[in-house]
């Protein structure tokens, strides 16, 4: 099979710049919908609907003209096809998910009302996950298809090689569970990596520790900036302002050995020292 034909599905050429790999395995699609459990009238948005493989069963289960499924899509060629296929049961938002205001779909009030799903483009998955975290207070849950390596980092425990900045920053915000493995042959064109389905449920505001998330991000970024070095080196800039001994924080460790709660404690101490 030629490279061009392998990238074509239903008359559409998958675009590398959009990270397009279309899900075609009906069994996997059914399994994904089963774990999402969409209900009629729910407020849901799909990121990157593509050719509508997941969109179709979601529309069937939850959409009405008064409460359509929402979708964010960047590829204009696909938008026309999706509009024609789903009509007023799908409300399309043309644009880049990295810049989209997901809070605008959550409705009035401050309670979580939005469910987010999608086969996320692997080339932007980490920045997109961080962008989505800014709307976590309005979100009920998220179900995503991602590169398996990314999912393993999301659910990694301290002490493992997969534990990373991504692990800390997302586990601070969400309860995260890996649900399903998805092989490359489930897609057209097949990606060069394995994939997985992950569920993310945001903690309620009262469950989150009081911490400046910008400070937390700075501390975690510094800690993981040189993974093989001890924290006494990577966090050296904080040693004048933070009493690590009083915190019970052992600097004779590497970044991947520190639980999320301890990073939060350091960030809180940094804020206290700065009077913020």
Swiss-Prot record:
GO cellular component: cytosol
EC number of the protein: 2.1.1.182
Cited InterPro entries: KsgA/Erm (IPR001737), rRNA_Ade_diMease-like_C (IPR023165), rRNA_Ade_methylase_Trfase_N (IPR020598), rRNA_adenine_dimethylase (IPR011530), SAM-dependent_MTases_sf (IPR029063)
Highest taxon above the source species: Bacteria
Gene3D superfamilies: Ribosomal RNA adenine dimethylase-like, domain 2, Vaccinia Virus protein VP39
Subcellular localization: Cytoplasm
SMART domains noted in UniProt: rADc
Keywords: Cytoplasm, Methyltransferase, RNA-binding, rRNA processing, S-adenosyl-L-methionine, Transferase
GO function term, MF aspect, one: 16S rRNA (adenine(1518)-N(6)/adenine(1519)-N(6))-dimethyltransferase activity
Catalysed transformations (reactions): adenosine(1518)/adenosine(1519) in 16S rRNA + 4 S-adenosyl-L-methionine = N(6)-dimethyladenosine(1518)/N(6)-dimethyladenosine(1519) in 16S rRNA + 4 S-adenosyl-L-homocysteine + 4 H(+)
Positions annotated to bind S-adenosyl-L-methionine: 21, 23, 48, 73, 96, 119
SUPFAM superfamilies: S-adenosyl-L-methionine-dependent methyltransferases
Similarity comment: Belongs to the class I-like SAM-binding methyltransferase superfamily. rRNA adenine N(6)-methyltransferase family. RsmA subfamily.
NCBIfam families recorded: ksgA (TIGR00755)
Main function: Specifically dimethylates two adjacent adenosines (A1518 and A1519) in the loop of a conserved hairpin near the 3'-end of 16S rRNA in the 30S particle. May play a critical role in biogenesis of 30S subunits.
Protein name as catalogued: Ribosomal RNA small subunit methyltransferase A
Species name: Paraburkholderia phymatum (strain DSM 17167 / CIP 108236 / LMG 21445 / STM815)
Name of the coding gene: rsmA
